[in-house]
Amino acid sequence: MDNMVDDKKVNQVVEQGKGIPHAEGADTPGWELPFLLLAGFRSLIDRLHTELAAQGHPDARPAHGFAMQAIGQDGATASELGRRLGISKQAAGKTADRLTALGYVSTAPDPTDARRKLLRLTPHGLDALNRSAAIFESLRAEWAESVGPGRVHDLEAALRTVVPASDRYRLDAAGWLGG
């Protein structure tokens, strides 16, 4: 059968990726690229949230940042939030409730439809996003100091080449990863 599991490849990432250094310029296994990209993303996000906590946002979580970006300056309904994040309306409602409880979001009647409630970022939510942007600038500068500004620029340029423009700033990672 074509869909049989190859026992030699099961857990290849776990077994082969345990800190084995690769020689400069040597070919690496195909699975390593997505894991390195994910690890780089995770490293940046974890450091972002450590710094956000130190700057007055101890309860902010990665999912909250995606949700606040999805709500945006113009606001969004729970249904719109769910669509933008790729999650159910119920999950979006829970996220909105949590953001409201933390003071990042408020609700107001939708001026175009009184039956709907519009989620809006509060000054506290805007502060979290503004601080996030500044922290990301600092983290990028650290990467540039570590590997050189040209290499960071080349990495960004290469990613812009292989990632379609329409996919570069998607906010639905939580829904995609979740299922």
Region locations from a protein language model:
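Residues within helix-turn-helix
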Residues: 78-79, 90, 97, 117
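N-terminal positioning helix adjacent to the helix-turn-helix/winged-helix DNA-binding module
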Residues: 29, 33, 62-64, 124, ...
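Base-recognition residues in the alpha-helical recognition helix of bacterial helix-turn-helix
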Residues: 39, 65-70, 93-94
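Exposed, interaction-prone assembly regions rather than primary DNA-binding/catalytic cores
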Residues: 153-179
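Charged, amphipathic alpha-helical coiled-coil/dimerization segments
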Residues: 3, 20, 97-160
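N-terminal leader segment of winged-helix/HTH proteins
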Residues: 1-59
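N-terminal helix-turn-helix DNA-binding core of bacterial DNA-binding proteins
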Residues: 46-88, 102, 171-176
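Short amphipathic alpha-helical segments with heptad-repeat character
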Residues: 31-34, 38, 42, 72, ...
